Amino acid sequence: SAASDVYKRQAFLLVYLVLAVLVGLAVMVGEFTIGRKTGMSPVAAYRKLSKKFTWLGYMAVICPFLVLCFYFVLGGMVMRYALGYLTAIFGWDTWNVANIADYFGSFIMNGGQMILWTAIFIALNALVVAAGVAEGIEKFCKIGMPALFIMLLIVIVYVAVQPGAMGGYKFMFGWNVEPLTEDFLKVLKTAAGQMFFSLSLGMGAMITYGSYLQKKESVQKNAVIVVICDTLVAIMAGMIVMPACYAFLGGETSSGPGLLFLSMQIVFEKMGYVGNIMGFLFYSLVFIAAISSSMSLLEVITSFKVDQNVAEGKAPGRKKYAILAACIIFVFCLPTCLDGLGAGTNGGATIGNPADVLGMHWAEAGDISEFAEGTDYYVKGDDGIYTKLAADEAFVEGETYYLNTAKTWNGDWLDFYDMLSEGILMPLGAMIMAFAIGWIWKIDMVVEECEASGHKFWGRVFFNICYKFITPIGMAFVLYAQVTDYFG
C-alpha cells in the first residue's frame, strides 16, 4: 500500500493488524450476517431489518459509486502499463522509456488517453457483472485469484535475490513507534482507510456477497478467511514494492499513484530486458486485484436495481442496469481523467481541482477584530478578483476579508472522491452498523444467523464488545482524523 510508504514500518502494520482483528473482522461478520439473513442487497436488506435504517443502505450504495469514480481510472492506467510491458517483451514497443517521469506526466495530462483506458476498464467490469455472480464474477475469480498468487510469488522471489532488497524488508518490518507517539491519529486514519478499502467494508459489497452465501456455509469461517487472505496479499505486495525500491532506487520512492506508476516503472527500467517481464507480471497482478475489487463494487450498485425490480414483480434487468450504472459512473470519472491527477488548469490540465470547479477556494474570514499572525488575508475587488494583502497592511474595521481555503482543501479529484467514500462514508457506515447490531438488534441476531448453518458461534463476548464499544468509538476517532486532515 502507498499508505504504508507515508506512515512507515510496523507502526502502520501494527495498527492495521489490530484494526483488522478488532474492527474489520467484526464488521465483515456483521455485513455477511445482514446479507445472508435478508438475502438482499444493502438498501433492501436494511429496509427488511428496520425501515428506520433504509438510509444506511442507500449510503452503502453511494459509497461504491464514489469509489469507482477514481478506481476505474486507476484500473485503466494499470491496464495501459500491463499491456505496455507485454508489447515490450515481444519487441513491439519500447516501454522502458528514457525519461519515465516525463512519460508519466504526459500520460496523466493526456485526457484522451486517460478517458480511453478508463472506458476500456469500465467496459470489462460491466461485461462481467452483467453476466451475474455465478457466470461472471465467480468464474473470473476462480481463474484470477490463483493467477494472482502465482504472479505474486514469482515477482517476490525475483526481487528477494536482488542486492539491497534486505533494506526494503527492514523498512517494512523494522520496529519504529515514532509515528504512534507523534501522530497517532494520522496513522490510525491511514491504516483504517487502507483496511476498509482493502476488505471492501462499509460499502455494501460484503452485504451483497453475503446475500449469495448459502445457509450451510459458516459466516465466521468465511470472514476469517477473507481477512487473513487479504492481509496476506497486501503484505506480499509490500514485499515486492519496498524491497524493489531499495534494491534499485536506494529506498527513494514516490507515494500514491506515483509509487505505482512512476517509482515501479523506474525499478523495472533498471532491470533491463527482464524488467519487461517483471513489469508485465507486476501490473498484471495489480490489474487482477483491481478488477476483482471494482467488479464487487459495481455489483453492489447493479444488485440494488435488480432487487428493486424483483420486489416490484418486474424482470431483474441485470444486463441493462450493469451497463447503465457503468455509463453513469464513467461520466463522473471524467474529472479524475482530466485534472492531471492534481495538476489542475494552472498545470495545463483540462479541468481544475475540486476547489476550483466547486468554488471552494474562498471563504469569509468571519467576524475578526485583528489579523491572525501567519494567516494570509484577501480582499475581493469589484471585478470579483481576490487580492492578497501585504504583510504590513493595516486592519480596517468593517472590511470583509477572505481566506484562501484551497490552501487546505487542495486535493485532486481522486482525493476528493476518496475523502467522501473511504474517509467519511466507509467508517460512518461501519460505525452505525456496529452500533445497531450492538445496541438495537443485539448480538443475538448475529449469533442466530451464524448458527443457522449448524456451526457454533465462537467469541460471543469478543464480538459483542466490538459491536458495542470498540468499532463505534474507534470509527469516531477515524472520522475525526479523516475530516481534520483533509480540511487542514
Describe the residue ranges of each PLM region.
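Short, small-residue-biased leader/transition segments that mark boundaries at the very start
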Residues: 2-7
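Flexible loop linkers connecting adjacent transmembrane helices
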Residues: 8-9, 29-56, 82-100, 135, ...
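Extracellular/periplasmic helix-exit of transmembrane alpha-helices
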Residues: 31, 158-172, 233-261, 328-373, ...
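Hydrophobic alpha-helical segments and their helix-loop junctions in multi-pass secondary transporters
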Residues: 71-94, 149-175, 246-247, 336-340, ...
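Membrane-interface loop-to-helix entry segments
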Residues: 74-85, 117-158
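Loop-to-transmembrane helix boundary motifs in multi-pass membrane proteins
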Residues: 115-116, 229-235, 279, 288-291, ...
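Membrane-embedded translocation segments of transport machinery
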Residues: 138, 142-295, 306-324
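C-terminal membrane-solvent junction of multi-pass transporters and transport-like membrane proteins
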Residues: 301-302, 309, 313-326, 413-475
